[in-house]
Amino acid sequence: MTQSASTAPSWSIDPADVARFSAIAAEWWDPRGKFAPLHVFNPCRLSFIREQALARFERDGNGRTPFEGLRLLDIGCGGGLLSEPMARLGFTVTAVDASEKNIKTAATHAAEQGLEIGYRPATAEQLLAEGAGPFDVVLTMEVVEHVADPGEFLRTCAKLLAPGGLMIVATLNRTLKALALAKIGAEYVLRWVPPGTHDWKQFLKPDELRAFLAGEPVDVHGPFGVAYNPLTGRWSRSADCDINYMMTVTKD
């Protein structure tokens, strides 16, 4: 018998964060709403994921659906801002989130777009306990800084990755610069995101992320910095990893 999301193994989940995002779940697809910063960030994230996946799986990027036949897991999918474009690129997408409200919002929007995405309220630990996967690609984008046990969470994600697969992690660096700009500036000065969205103490340094996965049969690459240009209003790749960065994880 399959466990429900409420009784499944979920020791990495932070209930307070789940409740915080559930409260604003209806706004996921509003480009001017509380998730507006993610809408602006999304093109940069999508470009990085596509580039890394094309290289890892040696696919031709000229077609509309270069990733047909590959299974992708989007962990902490929220309203589906990444799940939908991944499905359009040909991936068979499974997308999970600890918030049932997020999943309902995501599933409704996908149905309106005519997209088939396997949405369900669940945790990474639940999927592993059920024997789900393995998946060719695992995404955990802007999620690890919101969980209670980042090490356990990342190791669980790595276990869901298939041999030959690719995992991409995006998060925030625990630096004074990130505290000033991503926490105080973004939440309390510019009001880009609701106050309390982030806890600076939960931001991860790249070396910490790497250490969490040291016992897994994976290789960790990066960090790859990304930065926001207030003059253009766009995100782009950067050598600066002091605030936002991404890392890739491969399993051979």
Swiss-Prot record:
* Pathway membership, UniProt: Cofactor biosynthesis; ubiquinone biosynthesis
Catalysed reaction per UniProt?
a 3-demethylubiquinol + S-adenosyl-L-methionine = a ubiquinol + S-adenosyl-L-homocysteine + H(+); a 3-(all-trans-polyprenyl)benzene-1,2-diol + S-adenosyl-L-methionine = a 2-methoxy-6-(all-trans-polyprenyl)phenol + S-adenosyl-L-homocysteine + H(+)
Domain of life, per lineage: Bacteria
EC category: transferase
One Gene Ontology BP term is: methylation
Any GO MF annotation of the entry: 3-demethylubiquinol 3-O-methyltransferase activity
Q: InterPro entries, alphabetically?
A: SAM-dependent_MTases_sf, UbiG_MeTrfase
Keywords in alphabetical order, please.
Methyltransferase, S-adenosyl-L-methionine, Transferase, Ubiquinone biosynthesis
Binding annotation for S-adenosyl-L-methionine? R45, G76, D97, M141
Q: What is its EC number?
A: 2.1.1.222, 2.1.1.64
**Xref: NCBIfam families:** UbiG (TIGR01983)
Outline what the protein does.
O-methyltransferase that catalyzes the 2 O-methylation steps in the ubiquinone biosynthetic pathway.
Task: Give the family from UniProt.
Answer: Belongs to the methyltransferase superfamily. UbiG/COQ3 family.
Annotated protein name in UniProt? Ubiquinone biosynthesis O-methyltransferase
Species whose genome carries this gene: Caulobacter sp. (strain K31)
